[in-house]
Amino acid sequence: MASRLNPYFSFPGNAREAMEFYQRVFGGSLSTSTFGAMGTDDPALVDKIMHAMLETDRGFTLMGSDTAPGMEHDPGNNVSVSLSGDDADELRGYWEQLADGGTVTVPLEKQMWGDEFGMCVDRYGIGWMVNIGQPRD
């Protein structure tokens, strides 16, 4: 298998909800493992997500988990997930769903470099950038 680089998101207790949201946005197959399935009997953790992985038909892989007690959950603004390509309908569809219930920081519109570009933070605090380029011949 070739090496891959995949985003891994940490959530403050709502990983299942967030990963199911991304599955609705991107499609694909979602697998989850709870702390309970891995042997934890702590009632606060039994149903929380120890690891989730969403693999889509488009080749996207998103992973995530709930933050376990004793570990820090400190969302930042130093990383965003970038979606880019020239399939305008597909990318606008992702944009609309990701921005719904979130905060649009840069509206998805034509930019000075000629592409459509926008930035948002989704309802789970994850930053997204969408760039719709012109089809290249």
Per-region residue spans from a language model:
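A structural signal for short, well-ordered beta-strand segments
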Residues: P7-F9, V79-V81
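Short glycine/proline-enriched turns and hinge-like loops at secondary-structure junctions
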Residues: L45-V46, D74-N77
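Vicinal oxygen chelate
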Residues: A2-S3, S31-S33, M50-E55, F60-D66, ...
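Core segments of cupin and vicinal oxygen chelate
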Residues: F9-G59
